[in-house]
Amino acid sequence: MKKKLVSFGMAAMMAASLAACGGSKPAETTAAAGDAETTAAAEGAETEAAAEGGTLKVGVIGPLTGAGAAYGNAVANGAELAAKEINEAGGINGMMIETKAEDDENDPEKSINAYNTLKDWGMQVLDGPTTSKPCIAVGAEAESDNMFLITPSGSAVECVATDNAFRVCFADPDQGTASAKYIGENKLATKIAIIYDSSTEYSSGIREAFVAEAANQGLEIVADEAFTADSNTDFSVQLDKAKDAGAELVFLPIYYQEASIILKQAHDKEFAPIFFGCDGMDGILSVTNFDTSLAEGLMLLTPFSTTEESSKAFTEAYVAAYGIEPNQFAADSYDAIYAIKAAVEQAGVTADMSASDICDALKPAMTEISIDGLTGTGMVWNANGEPNKAPKAVKIVNGEYEMQ
C-alpha cells in the first residue's frame, strides 16, 4: 500500500514549536563514556543472552567511502554504539542486536547491491539507507520484500512512500518551511538569497518549500542561484549575484562541504551576510583545513547539538569509541536503533521470526511508541512514517554551537 506523499502536519508542528524549542525537556540517553571498552565479563553475558534469546540482525547502508563517507560512517557508528549499549543492558527481552554496515558510495545501484548483500547475511530490519537517492532505490526493493526500513537521514519525501518505511530525520519540505518561518518570525532579514544544489533531491526539496513559505513571511528572494555536483567548487557567480542584489541573508540548503567553500569565497569577496542552513550543515566545524572562524555567526536548524547537556554522555561515548565528535547523522542512527528496540518490544518480536513477519509486526507498533532520543523528546511516528519532534536553531559562536 502506498502512503500519501504529504507532510503538512509535520510542517505545522515544526513551525509552532520553533519559538519554544529552546525550553523543551532534555532528551534522555543511556550512553556512558565509561562503557567505551567492553569487559570480558560483559562479552560473556552477551554471548549467553544471545544463545538464550537469539539475535536480531539489523542492516545499515550508507556511503562508507567517497565524498559522503562522513555521513555513512556516522550512521554506522551511531547504530553500532546504540546496539552495544542495548546489548550490555541485557538486549531486548534477552535478544541481542547485531549490526552490519555495507557501503553504497552514495550510489543508488550500489545501494541495491548492499541491500542484497545484507539480505544474504540474514538481515531482518534495515537502518538506512543514509542518503535520499539510494534510499528511494532501496525502498522499492524493501517494499517488494516486505522488509521493515527506518532511514535515519533519508529526507526526500519519497523515502517513506511505502507503509514499511519510516524515518528519524525531518523531511525536506518541513525543513524549508520551518527555516523560512524562523527567519521571518525572528526578523533575521528581509532580503534573501538562496544558493542550492539542483542535482540533489535534498537541496531542491528544501529550497522549493522555503520559497513557498518565504512569500507568506514577507521575505523577498533577491537571488535564487543553483549549482550541481559537477560545478561545486567555484561559487563566484552565485555570490556576486547575491551581493549585488543586496542580500542580507543567504540560505544554504546544502551539505557542509560545499558550504565551507562558499564561506571562504564570500569572505574573500568581503561579503558578510547572515548564512543560514539546515541539518546538512551539521559538521561544518569538522571540515579538514577549514578556517572555522569563517563560520562564526552561521545559523542552522538541527534537532541535535553536542553541546546540549542531554547529548553529553552520548558525545563522550562516541568520541571514546571513534575518536571524533558525532554529527546529526550519528544521532539519527542512534535514535533509529532505539526506535527499533521500542517497536520490537511493543510488537513482541522474537529473533526466530522472518523479516516479513517482523515487518508486519513493526508497522503498527511504530505508531504506538514514544521515545526520548538525542534528536527529540517524546518522539512519535504517524502512519506515513514521519516523526513528530521539534527542530532547534543553533548559532556558531566562538567555534561552538549555541542554542537560540
Describe the residue ranges of each PLM region.
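Bacterial signal peptide processing site
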Residues: 22-25
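Positively charged n-region of N-terminal signal peptides that target proteins for export
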Residues: 1-10
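C-terminal motif of bacterial Sec signal peptides marking the signal peptidase cleavage site
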Residues: 17-20
